[in-house]
From Swiss-Prot:
This is Dermaseptin-S12. Residues 29-39 have a biased composition (Acidic residues). Belongs to the frog skin active peptide (FSAP) family. Dermaseptin subfamily. Residues 23-44 are annotated as: Disordered. It is found in: Secreted; Target cell membrane. Expressed by the skin glands. The keyword Secreted applies. Coiled coil: none annotated. Keywords: Amphibian defense peptide, Antibiotic, Antimicrobial, Cleavage on pair of basic residues, Fungicide, Immunity, Innate immunity, Membrane, Secreted, Signal, Target cell membrane, Target membrane. Antibacterial peptide with activity against Gram-positive and Gram-negative bacteria. May also be active against fungi. Residues 1-21 form the signal peptide. The keyword Secreted applies.
Length: 72
């Protein structure tokens, strides 16, 4: 009977430990996904700024070329 109780206790503690590990694993995965989302958002913001800068530079270059062509 005591062997049965000991075995039950070991199995119970093992399941509790496994459950805690699974919960921590899920939390870590959620944190990683959130970090990935934040990095993606930062990249999108950076790319939009780069595109805006490129548009502005292109407009300025076209204006400069038009001015140079107009002077000749």
């Amino acid at each position: 009977a005591s062997l049965k109780k000991s075995l039950f206790l070991v199995l119970f503690l093992g399941l509790v430990s496994l459950s805690i590990c699974e919960e921590e694993k899920r939390e870590n995965e959620d944190e990683e996904n959130q970090e990935d989302d934040e990095q993606s958002e930062m990249r999108r913001g950076l790319w939009s700024k780069i595109k805006e800068a490129a548009k502005t530079a292109g407009k300025m270059a076209m204006g400069f070329v038009n001015d140079m062509v107009g002077e000749q």
